[in-house]
Amino acid sequence: MTRIESTFETLKAQNKKALIPYVMAGDPNPSNFVGLLHDLVKHGADMIEVGLPFSDPMADGPTVALAGERALAAGTSTRDALKMVKEFRQQDTQTPIILMGYLNPVEIIGYDNFVSLCEQSGVDGILMVDLPPAEAGSFTQHLTEHAMNEIFLLSPTTLAERRQQVLTHCGGYIYYVSLKGVTGSATLDTDDVAKQVQAIKAETDLPVCVGFGIRDATSAKAIGAHADGIIVGSALVQNFADIDANDITAVANAQQKIMAKMDELRGALDSL
């Protein structure tokens, strides 16, 4: 059983929902990032999605795309992100870490080498936005051999054939994209999301977690009532926008705002 699977099993036994924050590796600066991960756990994160900075993030909305730009400007590479996860693992051996990114940086490192580095760093799951499940065969095999889960996206516009491929090949949890568009989009139709989540759960035993458009306690509670977990990114990383990454006070204040949002989201989920 992987760390992700074990965490969901524990949450189910406790009748709790997973809170999964998304943050960009190296944002706002590399020296603060590991501390940020630990603070997220202290404020209720059950697992964490870590974005891999990439120069052409086609599925990212402006908030997350800018986070990637800040991380790249600070010199954060995919290898650096893995080093940060490894440092996090020195103190936290329980909280699952999922890497979310794009294939190009992984292909540069090489699938075999990348998966080995992930295992050595303590990564638990991988979500490659631009890797279709039908083309993921060898990559999926490498991950399975190293006890890591490969996670795929489902969305309102996923075609039936692709949907079945995702349900067949996905591990850990299903990431359901609640909106048509990019990360950080607005207008969340909770009734439609509830129907979609119920339909997915009728086809798989995997937990279903919902991301895109969850910003506050109200949306967290509305979605958490139907999903096994929520994924929140833009509402957190937007706090690092327009600050001086070298200003210790500004970074600390931004992180305080992020943790206040985490407390709000955790409280909403725990009230269900």
UniProtKB/Swiss-Prot annotation:
Q: Does the keyword Ion transport apply?
A: no
EC numbers listed for it are 4.2.1.20
Q: Which SUPFAM superfamilies match?
A: Ribulose-phoshate binding barrel
Any idea which residues are catalytic in this one?
E49, D60
Q: What does this protein do?
A: The alpha subunit is responsible for the aldol cleavage of indoleglycerol phosphate to indole and glyceraldehyde 3-phosphate.
What does the similarity note say?
Belongs to the TrpA family.
Task: List, alphabetically, the NCBIfam families matched.
Answer: trpA (TIGR00262)
User: Can you say what this protein is called?
Assistant: Tryptophan synthase alpha chain
Q: Organism, per UniProt?
A: Psychrobacter cryohalolentis (strain ATCC BAA-1226 / DSM 17306 / VKM B-2378 / K5)
Instruction: Please spell out the taxonomic lineage of the organism that makes this protein.
Output: Bacteria, Pseudomonadati, Pseudomonadota, Gammaproteobacteria, Moraxellales
